[in-house]
């Protein structure tokens, strides 16, 4: 779902054969609009700056056999920097031990489980942590990696961006 982008996103996606859903700004609302428009038994929710790696779908079907589990990916950033590896490792540890994956780790969830937790929240930010909170005990990490663009971290700095993320979580 597009939340009012001003670049060529919609044009490029349309030319590639994608169906574009227009929604309001804010990830939660965009995700909700996409889910409503799509329908289906399972949803794979990804941020626009995330990339599935080659071979991701090999054997993927076995994870669709249990509607009571929502899955997220191991995170890796698109940067060779040491801080990219440190930040990605921390995100994976945080997700595993605290059950708090962020949206940049993706989410594979059955429609049945999504409905059982009253759907996705339309909040603009922290929709990922809100969903993780409601899915407590029903989340598991896939043995697959999702590549997320490191541009935001590299622009602001790994420590500053990380500190801002922690501050947002604390305020939430």
Feature-to-residue mapping (PLM):
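Short beta-strand/loop segment that forms part of the nucleotide-sugar
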Residues: 1-4, 21-23
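A conserved acidic beta->alpha catalytic loop
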Residues: 2-10, 50-51
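Glycine-rich, basic loop-to-helix element that forms the pyrophosphate-binding segment
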Residues: 12, 22-38
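Conserved nucleotide-sugar donor-binding
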Residues: 39-40, 104-118
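Short aromatic/hydrophobic "clamp" motif used to bind/position activated sugar donors
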Residues: 43
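Conserved donor NDP-sugar-binding/catalytic core segment of glycosyltransferases
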Residues: 54-83
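A short, conserved alpha-helix in the catalytic core of glycosyltransferases
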Residues: 113-117, 123-141, 145
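Hydrophobic helical membrane-anchoring modules
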Residues: 133-172
């Amino acid at each position: 779902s597009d939340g009012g982008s001003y670049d060529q996103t919609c044009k490029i996606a349309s030319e590639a054969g994608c169906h574009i859903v227009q929604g309001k700004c804010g990830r939660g609302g965009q995700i909700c609009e996409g889910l409503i428009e799509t329908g289906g038994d399972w949803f794979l929710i990804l941020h626009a700056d995330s990339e599935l790696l080659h071979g991701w779908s090999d054997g993927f079907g076995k994870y669709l056999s249990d509607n009571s589990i929502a899955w997220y990916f191991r995170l890796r950033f698109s940067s060779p920097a040491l801080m990219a590896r440190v930040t990605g490792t921390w995100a994976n540890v945080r997700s595993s031990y605290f059950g708090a994956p962020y949206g940049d780790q993706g989410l594979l969830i059955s429609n049945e489980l999504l409905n059982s937790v009253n759907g996705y929240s339309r909040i603009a930010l922290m929709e990922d942590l809100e969903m993780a909170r409601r899915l407590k005990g029903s989340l598991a990490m896939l043995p697959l990696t999702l590549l997320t663009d490191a541009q935001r971290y590299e622009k602001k700095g790994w420590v500053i961006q990380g500190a801002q993320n922690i501050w947002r979580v604390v305020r939430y």
